Amino acid sequence: MPKQVLVVDNESGSRRNIAFLLREQGYEVDEADDGLTALNLVDKRTFDLLICDVVMPRLSAFEVVRRLESSHASTSVILITGHPDLLDEKGLGHLPCFTKPFNLYDLLRRVKQVLGE
């Protein structure tokens, strides 16, 4: 059964590129354009991995990760951001993070590592 990945980014081009690459690699991918939509999807399905932009409208990655850690602890998280300085400040410095712009194939390698592949 393919691994379930949720890609969350309000920048549609970035989100679509990540989702396309992951689908090409055989992952089942859902997309969300903000944190609130992401949490609604997480409440309906179980995901192996969440790839999430840090700064988004309606609900930031900080709140999404906090809720995930309390209710879906088995879901791994990779953050993407243009503001890496915010991670330590908000207590998320322990999570893997890619600073925009980043190489999609570097992200793919990290996805495989995080998912134990």
Language-model-detected regions and their locations in the chain:
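Hydrophobic/aromatic residues positioned on beta-strands within the core alpha/beta folds
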Residues: 78-81
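Acidic, metal-coordinating helix/loop segments flanking the phosphotransfer/catalytic sites
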Residues: 6, 31-49
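Charged docking surfaces used in two-component/phosphorelay signaling
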Residues: 16-24
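Conserved phosphotransfer cores of two-component systems
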Residues: 43-45, 67-75, 86, 90
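Receiver (REC) domain active-site loop signature in two-component systems and cognate sites
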Residues: 56
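Acidic catalytic/metal-coordinating carboxylates
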Residues: 34-37, 60-66
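Alpha4 helix (beta4-alpha4-beta5 surface) of REC/receiver domains from two-component response regulators
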Residues: 63, 83-100, 105, 109
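Active-site residues of response regulator receiver
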Residues: 53
